[in-house]
């Protein structure tokens, strides 16, 4: 007989050919940059979005309404990418759960940023074209931006009704906006008035609160004294004995906007604050008692140089009349609750044309509005010798004039948070102009009541939007620009009547439906109004149309009507299930949608509001090209593919601000690769598995297999919980832990021998394949919402007999948790076995480090673990497979020829050389037959 150690290379190869080595058509490298577009083409050609929605019962629906991104650029920011990805993840998951979950993308196409960009490219500027021509150019710009953004959204793997998105610049949308305006006007919720509003002198338009950003700004603060007139002095003398003097008396105000002093019409005090009168340098002043010390310090007056005379309440000063230091007019003292003790003197400079609180307190005293500035922020003729000077140059001029007349007590630069225009980033002012307002106060209580019915994620969102709605003033919805939806109002030229009727609103709406809102500038008033219409007040027929357009927040804020209700067949109910946007939309789209919806239909337009944070660079700073931390979505996609970007979106706790950068992306690319390798290993070992014929019943599985299914049960349970709670980062953690720890480091590591060396059709191998089949089927479904391209690539390489006729993974259902898989008792047992395995590995590792052994199959282990002896004894036959050693014995005594001894937590492991010789087929050390293989291998070959 030939010696078994004298085996030829050909004979060794023959044994290798008997192994069940993995086979799969799934490539090792994802090659995502090339394959993802091919996958998207497959989805489009096979109408996957249509199939995803048409196969679902509309009675069981999840409607996520898309907040429209602004069309100021063809390129999207990484924050916009995050938003779209989160929406798409949710839509895909809900579809898997059996919901009818359509997605209608939207775009916001009106507004000043687009108008400004268009004007910059017009030779001769705005005045070189007609309003109609300008609007046409803006419309073309918006449509070009839409094409670019749509292409980038699709490249992210976002599925939706791309053939029929909604646009705020479409005629049908604009028509519904006009109808909402008409309904709100009819209810008395919209009015026109002269009132101070945020005004951008650079952009020459009013701004809503949502269009204002706060940034640090250096201003000059000044203290100015106003001398009381003789009548007021006599009144003070008669009221207070301590003022029985012939000295001059002054009120002192503090302001950070010296340029508004020419517009001062009053001084406000708090009726219940205490004010202290004191003498300094032979003059008498007063200041709020709580601010006196700070005031003296600011004007550099020493306390020992003043003489306190007495105190009074603010209400005692009401209607006294100091004289304006620059003009021959009086500035009466008013009582206002807005006065605080934060800074100054407790006497507030009051210019009703340049401050909302100033305006409100002056209204109570029937003091009119005075705002001598034009739309560019230049003083008008009303300002006298200041006429023609821009307000921002006025500070130094006003300060010099106050010095000249002896009214300036002190001036100093301060840095503070100041409102800036969100478009041009320049400081804004308050300016009183005729504007259209939504009178929020008339339905504020109902809006607050509706907020309480909405689920906010995170929960802090409720308080945030509630506080904003509770504290907000009237909503200024008019804008003095060209590119937007015109305010559908007419004025009678004969009697001045403001005309907004059901008839005019519907006529304009129908014209917009046919020709878009461009009709407003294209046609005359006569053509825009119903035929034969006469003024309801005077009966005349001479009309003038409104020139202002609506705030873009009003545009997008009516999408619940213009989109959700108008497309009821597709988006089949209101309120919708969810609005999902970045957190600053509490003051933007969430709020404008809430206000228009409550005003017209008495309810919130959404059931849930989910917000995510802003995206910053890897260093935690705002993204900037100059800082080198700016990263674009298409940069990541070109290098790694879209699924990496999607994986990033799922890996972060989006409720807070989020970081992204090269290092983060590289780490995610490694995780992506490991997930693919895991799936590839599973598929490779299922090449000959037919679930119809080879599936092994649960009761016939080994405990190790049952434990793997228990871990799968837990994975499905945990990721389902994560998705239902919108905590995608927990999904990511669960998936990563399952793939890296439960599978790669444990189950798959252990069963390789069984898969490769057992008989091809043996129960042992088929049992393992059954488990791997279940894991693969679940895993590819679980990764689909987040990594759909990867999931589709895997699915298209799954053997047909394992696909159940499923054309695409997009059409899959969420994995099922079979109750029998849930086995907590088995988990407790395996926790002890796993602990033992770790200790065994620690016992072997020094021998490998010292190169005394190569593979762990070269050793036998003897385990003495009294605490778990019975458990280990019950599965002793499987321990060598679990430990990946040639032999494993539950021992009471130390064996001979021990190579290493290791003890931990009451468990002692003795390591010896393995018994027998190395089987050239399975590489375990056993008793070998004449062919040089062990009996297990001989049995496997003989099948």
Segments predicted by a language model, with ranges:
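Secondary-structure capping and boundary motifs in well-ordered enzyme cores
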Residues: 56, 60-67, 78-82, 86, ...
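Residue patterns forming the tRNA-binding/recognition surfaces of aminoacyl-tRNA synthetases
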Residues: 2-32, 38, 42-46, 119-262, ...
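N-terminal catalytic cores of NTP/NDP-binding nucleotidyl/phosphoryl-transfer enzymes
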Residues: 54-117, 177, 253-259, 268, ...
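Acidic, turn-prone loop/beta-hairpin segments
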Residues: 108, 197, 201, 207-215, ...
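Short functional micro-motifs and their immediate structural scaffolds
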Residues: 208, 429, 500, 542-544, ...
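Cys/His-coordinated zinc-binding microdomains
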Residues: 204, 480, 496, 539-540, ...
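Protease-associated
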Residues: 266, 273-347, 356, 360
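Cys/His-clustered metal-coordination modules, chiefly Zn-binding fingers
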Residues: 907-943
């Amino acid at each position: 007989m030939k010696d078994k150690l004298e085996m030829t290379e050909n004979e060794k190869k023959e044994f290798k050919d008997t192994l069940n080595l993995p086979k799969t058509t799934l490539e090792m490298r994802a090659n995502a940059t090339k394959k993802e577009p091919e996958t998207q083409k497959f989805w489009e050609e096979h109408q996957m979005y249509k199939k995803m929605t048409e196969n679902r019962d509309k009675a069981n629906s999840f409607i996520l309404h898309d907040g429209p991104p602004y069309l100021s650029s063809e390129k999207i920011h990484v924050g916009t990418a995050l938003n779209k990805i989160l929406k798409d993840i949710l839509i895909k998951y809900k579809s898997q759960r059996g919901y009818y979950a359509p997605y209608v993308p939207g775009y916001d196409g009106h507004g000043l940023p687009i108008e400004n960009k268009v004007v910059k490219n017009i030779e001769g500027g705005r005045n070189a074209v007609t309003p109609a021509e300008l609007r046409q150019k803006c419309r073309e710009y918006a449509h070009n931006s839409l094409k670019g953004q749509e292409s980038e959204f699709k490249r992210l793997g976002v599925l939706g009704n791309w053939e029929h998105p909604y646009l705020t610049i479409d005629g049908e949308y604009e028509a519904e906006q006009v109808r909402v305006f008409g309904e709100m006007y009819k209810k008395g919720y919209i009015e026109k008035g002269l009132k101070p509003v945020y005004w951008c002198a650079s952009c020459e338009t009013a701004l809503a609160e949502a269009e204002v950003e706060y940034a640090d700004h250096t201003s000059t603060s000044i203290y100015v004294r106003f001398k009381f007139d003789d009548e007021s002095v006599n009144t003070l003398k008669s009221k207070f004995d301590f003022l029985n003097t012939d000295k001059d008396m002054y009120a002192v105000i503090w302001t950070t906007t010296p340029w508004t002093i020419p517009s001062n019409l009053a001084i406000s005090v708090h009726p219940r604050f205490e004010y202290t009168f004191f003498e300094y340098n032979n003059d008498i002043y007063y200041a709020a008692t709580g601010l006196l010390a700070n005031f003296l310090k600011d004007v550099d007056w020493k306390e020992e140089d003043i003489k306190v005379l007495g105190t009074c309440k603010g209400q005692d000063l009401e209607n006294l009349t100091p004289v304006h230091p620059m003009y021959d007019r009086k500035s009466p003292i008013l009582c206002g609750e807005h006065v605080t003790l934060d800074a100054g003197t407790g006497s507030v400079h009051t210019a009703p044309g340049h401050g909302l609180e100033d305006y409100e307190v002056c209204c109570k005293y029937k003091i009119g509005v005075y705002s001598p500035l034009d739309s560019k922020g230049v003083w008008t003729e009303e300002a006298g010798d200041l006429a023609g000077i821009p307000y921002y140059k006025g500070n130094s001029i006003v300060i010099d004039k106050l010095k000249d007349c002896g009214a300036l007590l002190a001036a100093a630069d301060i840095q503070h948070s100041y409102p800036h225009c969100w478009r041009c980033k320049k400081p804004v002012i308050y300016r009183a102009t005729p504007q259209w307002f939504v009178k929020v106060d008339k339905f504020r209580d109902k809006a607050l009541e509706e907020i309480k019915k909405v689920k906010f994620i995170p929960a802090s969102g409720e308080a945030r939007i509630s506080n904003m709605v509770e504290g907000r003033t009237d909503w200024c919805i008019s804008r003095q620009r060209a590119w937007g939806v015109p305010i559908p109002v007419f004025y009678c030229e004969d009697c001045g009547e403001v005309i907004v009727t059901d008839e005019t609103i519907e006529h304009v709406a129908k014209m917009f439906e046919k020709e878009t809102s461009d009709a407003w500038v294209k046609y005359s008033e006569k053509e825009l109004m119903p035929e034969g219409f006469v003024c309801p007040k005077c009966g005349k027929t001479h009309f003038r149309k409104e020139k202002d357009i609506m705030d873009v927040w009003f545009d997008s804020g009516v999408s619940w009507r213009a989109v959700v209700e108008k497309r009821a067949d597709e988006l089949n109910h209101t309120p919708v299930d969810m609005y999902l946007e970045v957190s600053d939309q509490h003051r933007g789209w969430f709020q404008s949608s809430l206000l228009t919806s409550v005003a017209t239909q008495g309810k919130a337009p959404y059931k849930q509001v989910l917000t995510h944070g802003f995206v910053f660079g890897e260093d935690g700073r705002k993204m900037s090209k100059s800082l080198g931390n700016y990263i674009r979505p298409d940069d990541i996609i070109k290098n790694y593919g879209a699924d990496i970007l999607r994986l990033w979106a799922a890996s972060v706790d989006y409720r807070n601000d989020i970081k992204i950068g090269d290092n983060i992306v590289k780490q995610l690319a490694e995780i992506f690769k490991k997930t693919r390798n895991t799936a590839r290993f599973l598929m490779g070992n299922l090449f000959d598995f037919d679930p119809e014929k080879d599936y092994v019943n649960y009761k016939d599985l080994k405990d190790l297999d049952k434990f793997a299914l228990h871990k799968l049960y837990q994975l499905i349970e945990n990721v389902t919980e994560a998705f239902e709670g919108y905590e995608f980062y927990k999904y990511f953690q669960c998936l990563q832990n399952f793939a890296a720890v439960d599978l790669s480091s444990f189950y798959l590591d252990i069963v390789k021998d069984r898969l490769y060396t057992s008989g091809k059709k043996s129960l042992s191998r088929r049992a393992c394949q059954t488990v791997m089949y279940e894991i693969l089927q679940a895993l590819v479904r679980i990764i689909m919402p987040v990594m759909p391209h990867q999931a589709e690539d895997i699915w298209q390489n799954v053997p047909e007999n394992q696909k159940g006729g499923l054309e695409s993974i997009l059409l899959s259902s969420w994995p099922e948790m079979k109750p029998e898989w849930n086995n907590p008792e088995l988990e407790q047992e395996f926790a002890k076995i796993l602990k033992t395995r770790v200790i065994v590995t620690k016992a072997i590792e020094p021998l490998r480090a010292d190169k005394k052994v190569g593979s762990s199959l070269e050793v036998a282990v003897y385990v003495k673990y009294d605490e778990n002896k019975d458990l280990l004894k019950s599965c002793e036959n499987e321990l060598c497979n679990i430990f990946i050693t040639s032999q494993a014995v539950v021992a009471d005594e130390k064996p001979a020829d021990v190579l290493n001894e290791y003890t931990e937590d009451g468990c002692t492991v003795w390591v010896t050389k393995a018994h027998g010789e190395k089987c050239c087929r399975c590489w375990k050390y056993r008793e070998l037959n004449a062919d040089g293989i062990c009996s297990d291998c001989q049995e496997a070959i003989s099948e």
